[in-house]
Regions:
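Catalytic-core regions of core metabolic enzymes
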Residues: 1-290
Length: 290
């Protein structure tokens, strides 16, 4: 019922000897993720939490058959880390790093597309398939295995919605934090299609926010391609135009990207929009009864 990662995922951690990399490598391994290695130039032969360290992604893949990488490196080096992962044979790259220059993100995303590699992020919390695998920085205790897909532009609101879903008895198939920057990898349409194609996923929770037109495009995509129940929450409903709210991509500009416009787009195609995150489970259950 999961997408992108599962119990067979073989994960490496780029930047594993750094503070964030080592901390989250330990947490992911503790959760049960198959963390098979990490990279840090010049530190091959070391171990972090019992995880072997390699100089390069190519070396790590050759030794461990890793297929997924998560990146914890400073923003100026994130593009090179993504390119190295793509060239090294990784099929799914998750970039946690915040503050990646936009042109660096554009270059990395373009190269990934050319090479057929999937990317999550940058500036994202990663993803989790509960009780199977977690590649990210998410608080695992709130998640429960189930049949609802979760797609979110917001990190902390993901956790709030997931907590509400779990409390309502709606476990999650996979929860994906797509990232809050203007340029990121997999987005609403691609992930909605993956959940649509996954036979055991029966519903979707989508968390959007102000800025850009991703939610408007998602609404049209749902109308044309998605038959499973979807419930939506849009953050930033009180945000003033021109002021950045948290993420680099969360800004209303040129008279577009407001919460009201996004809410209207979903309601126009029959997708219910929650005014509070706590309403998401009820909206999904109402649709599943039809």
């Amino acid at each position: 019922m999961s997408i992108l990662i599962n119990k067979n995922t073989r994960l490496i951690v780029q930047g594993i000897t750094g503070r964030d990399g080592s901390f989250h490598a330990s947490k992911m391994k503790e959760y049960g993720t198959n963390v098979v290695g990490g990279t840090s130039p010049g530190k091959a032969g070391q171990e972090v939490c019992g995880i072997p360290v390699f100089n390069t992604v190519k070396d790590a893949v050759a030794a461990t058959q890793a297929n997924t990488s998560i990146i914890f490196v400073p923003a100026p080096f994130a593009k090179d880390a993504m390119l190295e992962a793509i060239d090294g044979g990784i099929q799914l790259v998750i970039c946690i790093t915040e503050g990646v220059p936009t042109l660096d993100a554009v270059a990395a995303q373009h190269y990934a597309k050319v090479r057929g590699v999937k990317v999550i992020g940058p500036n994202c919390p990663g993803l989790i398939s509960p009780e199977e695998s977690m590649a990210g920085i998410m608080p695992t205790n709130i998640f429960k295995k189930g049949h609802t897909g979760v797609i979110s532009r917001s990190g902390t609101l993901t956790y709030e919605v997931v907590h509400n879903l779990t409390q309502a008895g709606l476990g999650q198939a996979t929860a994906v934090g797509v990232g809050g920057d203007p340029v990121v990898g997999l987005y609403f349409e691609e992930l909605l299609q993956m959940f649509q194609d996954e036979p055991e996923t029966d519903s979707n929770a989508l968390i959007g926010e102000i800025g850009g037109d991703a939610e408007e495009r998602a609404a049209q995509f749902i109308k044309e391609h998605v038959t499973k129940p979807v419930a939506v929450f849009i953050s930033g409903q009180q945000a003033p135009p021109g002021k950045q709210m948290g993420h680099a991509g969360a800004i209303i500009s040129s008279g577009s990207g407001s919460a009201s416009e996004k809410i209207a787009a979903f309601e126009a195609v029959g997708v219910p929009v929650a005014r509070e995150t706590s309403e998401i489970p009820t909206l999904l259950k109402q649709q599943m009864k039809k």
